[in-house]
Swiss-Prot record:
Transmembrane segments: 3-23, 43-63, 68-88, 102-122, 129-149, 160-180, 186-206
Segments forming domain MtN3/slv: 10-94, 127-212
Subcellular location, record wording: Golgi apparatus membrane; Cell membrane
Mediates interaction with TRPV2, as annotated region: 149-221
InterPro entries, per the entry: SWEET, SWEET_rpt
Its membrane topology: Multi-pass membrane protein
GO CC terms in record: Golgi membrane; plasma membrane
Tissue specificity as recorded in UniProt: Expressed at high levels in lung, placenta, spleen and thymus, at intermediate levels in brain, heart, kidney and testis, and at low levels in bone marrow, liver and lymph node. Within the thymus expression is highest in non-lymphoid cells.
Listed name of the protein: Sugar transporter SWEET1
Organism: Mus musculus (Mouse)
UniProt similarity note: Belongs to the SWEET sugar transporter family.
MF GO annotations: glucoside transmembrane transporter activity; sugar transmembrane transporter activity
Length: 221
């Protein structure tokens, strides 16, 4: 195998490994729900939006014929659906959960209908779907920024997951390089905010380490 082929294979494997590692961080929430039989301190919307994101990128991967995208997002969609079903099972407010799920599913179905029925040209469909996936992914990476102000205000990183931050950093970096290698801006660009937000979170962990977090809470009590 040529050097370029080895590099591409290694990069593809890195994307799969790091992304599945990021998705698997939700397993701790799943175990918490099973152990406590409740959804206390667990947010539902990230599961739902990540599932929609996975299904969108899965469609892009199928249309593009990219096996790496197909594998990663197929497994991701299955895991996120599992988290959603568990949340629905243990949540006492099932009506709100079902309403949010139905709303995003309706949007997803409308999107599929538009891309597959009203955009017959394959290249135009690929570009428009790639643009949609990129914008959706960027919005997901930037949405937690509002929480960062609260972290600075409280001087506490309790609401942040260190393992998820590391996984997101490696995941975003590997996909950015992968997209650059393929010369696909729809893959490269949306992962750059993921690198940026992960570095910001790591900076907050350095500024407000867990030990300081505990001392600060003791002073507050």
């Amino acid at each position: 195998m040529e050097a370029g082929g080895v590099a591409d294979s290694f990069l593809s494997s890195a994307c799969v490994l790091f992304t599945l590692g990021m998705f698997s961080t939700g397993l701790s929430d799943l175990r918490h729900m099973q152990r406590t039989r409740s959804v206390d301190n667990i947010q539902f919307l990230p599961f739902l939006t990540t599932d929609v994101n996975n299904l969108s990128w899965l469609s892009y991967g199928v249309l593009k014929g990219d096996g790496t995208l197909i594998i990663v997002n197929s497994v991701g969609a299955v895991l996120q659906t599992l988290y959603i079903l568990a949340y629905l099972h243990y949540s006492p407010q099932k009506h709100g959960v079902l309403l949010q799920t139905a709303t995003l599913l309706a949007v997803l179905l409308l999107g599929y209908g538009y891309f597959w029925l009203l955009v017959p040209d394959l290249e135009a469909r690929l570009q428009q779907l790639g643009l949609f996936c990129s914008v959706f992914t960027i919005s997901m990476y930037l949405s937690p920024l509002a929480d960062l102000a609260k972290i600075v205000q409280t001087k506490s990183t309790q609401r942040l997951s260190f393992s998820l931050t590391i996984a997101t950093l490696f995941c975003s970096a590997s996909w950015s390089i992968y997209g650059f290698r393929l010369r696909d801006p729809y893959i490269t660009v949306p992962n750059l905010p993921g690198i940026l937000t992960s570095l910001i979170r790591l900076g907050l962990f350095c500024k407000y380490p867990p030990e300081q977090d505990r001392k600060y809470r003791l002073l507050q009590t």
